[in-house]
A protein has these predicted regions:
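A short acidic, glycine-rich active-site loop
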Residues: 23-40
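Glycine-rich, Arg-bearing micro-motifs that act as flexible, cationic patches
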Residues: 81-107
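Structural beta-alpha unit
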Residues: 47-82
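Short, well-ordered secondary-structure micro-motifs
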Residues: 13-16, 68-71, 94-96
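Short, flexible loop segments at boundaries between secondary-structure elements
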Residues: 110-116
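Small/aliphatic-rich secondary-structure junction motif
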Residues: 1-24, 48-57
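Short, hinge-like loop/turn segments at secondary-structure boundaries
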Residues: 18-22, 75-77, 100-101
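Conserved beta-strand termini and adjacent loop/short-helix elements that scaffold enzyme active sites
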Residues: 4-6, 59-63, 115
Length: 116
């Protein structure tokens, strides 16, 4: 099993004549924040897999399009199956926010199992 985490990409702060509209985070600080979040999330996954007797490797990246990173990682690791959760968004929130799970389903040639 490979547990995988995709964090948000680094983006520079936005400046205007009046104020800084977003707190500046350097690329190095951003990478450290993504690593911290990934370590926390993947640690939970690895602990559960280990408790069930399932070997588990962990990997993470950041990217603008998480679904593409997931599909690429599945191919890179020669995965037989992608397991994803569904948050069950409905209506306007799904239209506005989209669904990474739906996008993986649409773009992956590797089978996808969706759990609620």
């Amino acid at each position: 099993m490979t547990a995988f985490y995709v964090g948000p990409p680094w983006q520079p702060g936005v400046y205007s004549d009046f104020a800084i509209t977003a707190a500046y985070v350097s690329p190095q600080q951003h990478a450290a924040q993504v690593k911290k979040a990934a370590t926390r999330y993947l640690g939970v996954m690895k602990k559960a897999a280990t408790a069930a007797g399932v070997p588990c490797s962990c990997a993470y990246t950041s990217g603008e399009y998480p679904y593409l990173e997931i599909v690429k990682a599945a191919h890179r690791n020669r995965c037989d199956l992608i397991l994803m959760a569904s948050h069950g968004r409905r209506g306007i929130s799904r239209l506005l926010l989209g669904s990474e799970t739906s996008k993986v389903l649409a773009h992956s040639t590797v089978p996808v199992l969706v759990c609620r």
